[in-house]
Amino acid sequence: MLDKLPILRTRAALRQKVEQLEAMSAEMKGLREQLSEMTALKRAVEKSTKLLETHKTPVVSAKDLKRIVKHERQNYREAPPFPNIVLDNFVDAGILRRVANEVAAMDRTGWHRTTTPRERKLSTEDESVFGPFTRRIFAALNSSLFVTFLEELTGIEGLIADPHLRGGGLHEIERGGLLGVHADFNFYKRMHLWRRLNVLIYLNAEWNEEWGGHLELWDGEAKTCVKRIAPTFNRAVIFDTSSRSYHGHPHPLNCPEGQSRRSLALYYYTVDYPYPEDLTPHSTLFISDQPQ
């Protein structure tokens, strides 16, 4: 009879409701955890899909290279102060952003550091420390497709890429750094080849003009700067090299601490050399070393 009393029946009903609510709460918690796991899985799948798409994307398209040759070949060969060209948005931006991120995260311990009045920079040509996208972009820029493009653009036949990246690879200039105006070494002893062409690609997003860091191309007498090129993200500079192709970054970099000027550098060679007056092998010729 006691369970038939109104107050006791009410308490029993309340207990039942509380138990039902607790069960529903536990079920909702489980559903939320499942939803969180599904959301994380979805993001992982999307990230993997984007990564796969990036792997399928060419570093630079053959169509774009043909277009550049068609429209810029003559401009390249006639450009002052020596054959050169500046190409913006040159490689796939997504791939280059990944390269920039890899380079930013690298341990600089094994990099070569130069600290002289005419040259203050870091560099590495050690491919074993490159990230996967960095290795991929260097492979593409040393490929037959790209070397053929360079031959057609510049008119230099028989170009040979350097798998060892001698003097090239990754370059970095920190605040206060510089690279004096110079002409490059002309003979590559290891491969018995003559240096003919430089390709530089810059990694610097949101570069501020006030920081400086411009690449300067000087006249053949090393007296006057003819062209200044800001090192902005995805800008490529291609130019002929000889003992009169003076260039450099001669003014100390004025970027904030923690910022730096980063670039990819690749050099190309030939067996023959068209400059009979310059057949004596030499190292880098800095104008600061020459008598005034």
Go through the PLM ranges and name each one.
Residues 56-58, 107-109, 157-160, 205-209:
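Proline-centered turn/helix-capping motifs that create local helix->coil transitions or kinks
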Residues 101-104, 129, 138-195:
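Non-heme Fe(II) oxygenase catalytic core, chiefly the N-lobe of the double-stranded beta-helix
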